[in-house]
A protein has these predicted regions:
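Long, low-complexity, charge-biased intrinsically disordered regions
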Residues: 1-339
Length: 339
């Protein structure tokens, strides 16, 4: 709430006749570091944007974010050219954008000012609003352009700075920014300029990027990408952290088919108690980011998302057992192999 007060996110006013106020709620989150250790507890007040009306209190909603394919290319270039990587985090990012629409919101639970007719008239964007991402991206885009960065046409989540023999890549994912430049590049002027516009946290050399764990060996010029912590959390969430490790994603000769799907409503109802779709979604994410070795298994399992049977469920658990035994598998970039 102190952040909202300092930011002048809203002002308390009496709800005008004919206007309606959307709701608000508290969202609690435990933030962890790359190794799974506790970073901090976060309490975020969000607007109930699902009650907004299109064309009335919001118009645009789209906000670009950097693609994983772009990240892989940048990491490959960083390995080949021995670039320095520096991570930045913008605190309370969505609170920086100014709203164009007139939006009223009921006061947060536990913080009441005035009578029952008094509400918050939003002056700045807020988490939960339909247009929050678009408003924030518009603000960040204008700041980066003023600093001399240019947005690439191939990926609107990637900015490039080229001036006075200084070349910097800047991939943007909402409020997470990464600076990539040649060794010896002084990032301080860029960080100071960003700090004059936003509350910024300099996280130092990049060890985590879009959930990917980054490990660098500057002596041997290698960079590796892993998802150990994500896999550990996945196993714990589904209660199989102590499962027996196995060596293959699917059983040799495994052939899943629709004939193994439930044939009656009772059988389908029985299968709904298992988090099949949740697990397959996590496997698809892993296959896309850092574990291509499970791509085939994840794709096969995804074919039966609408009506999985017991055999499909056992196959999904089989992949989890494989991940248990391959926690430390990494994608490794080697500079001499990229030439």
């Amino acid at each position: 709430m102190e952040a909202h007060r300092l930011n002048s996110t809203w002002e308390i006013v009496k709800l005008p006749p004919g206007q309606r106020a959307i709701g608000s709620r508290w969202f609690m989150k435990v933030k962890t570091n790359a190794d799974g250790s506790l970073d901090c507890y976060k309490a975020r007040m969000v607007a109930k944007g699902y009650s907004q009306c299109p064309g009335f209190d919001f118009k645009e909603t789209f906000a670009p974010t950097v693609r994983y394919s772009t990240i892989w290319i940048i990491l490959a270039i960083a390995t080949l050219e021995d670039l320095e990587l520096c991570s930045l985090d913008i605190s309370h990012a969505y609170l920086n954008g100014k709203l164009e629409e007139e939006i009223y919101m009921r006061q947060p639970e536990g913080f009441k000012v005035g009578g029952p007719d008094y509400v918050c008239r939003l002056k700045k964007s807020l988490y939960g609003l339909k247009q929050a991402g678009w408003v924030w991206n518009k603000k960040l885009h204008s700041v980066l352009l003023s600093m001399g960065f240019e947005r690439t046409q191939s990926d609107h989540g990637l900015y490039i700075f080229q001036r006075d023999n200084i070349h910097i890549f800047l991939p943007v994912f909402v409020d997470d920014l990464t600076l990539a430049g040649k060794k010896g590049t002084n990032f301080d002027p860029f960080i100071e300029e960003l700090s004059s516009h936003f509350k910024l946290c300099d996280l130092g050399p990049t060890t985590q990027l879009l959930g990917l764990e980054i490990h660098r060996d500057c002596t041997n010029l290698t960079l590796s990408i892993s998802q150990r912590q994500f896999i550990t959390n996945l196993l714990q969430d589904h209660g199989v952290q102590d499962c027996k490790p196995i060596s293959t994603p699917l059983n040799p000769g495994c052939c899943l088919s629709t004939s193994m799907c439930p044939q009656t409503e009772a059988e389908a109802l029985e299968m709904r108690q298992y988090p099949y779709i949740s697990i397959v979604g996590s496997l698809m994410y892993l296959a896309l980011t850092a574990r291509p070795d499970i791509a085939y298994a994840a794709r096969v399992l995804a074919r039966f998302n609408s009506n999985p049977g017991p055999t499909h469920w056992q196959a999904a658990k089989h992949v989890l057992q494989y991940l248990k035994g391959t926690l430390d598998h990494k994608l490794v970039y080697k500079a001499f192999q990229l030439i």
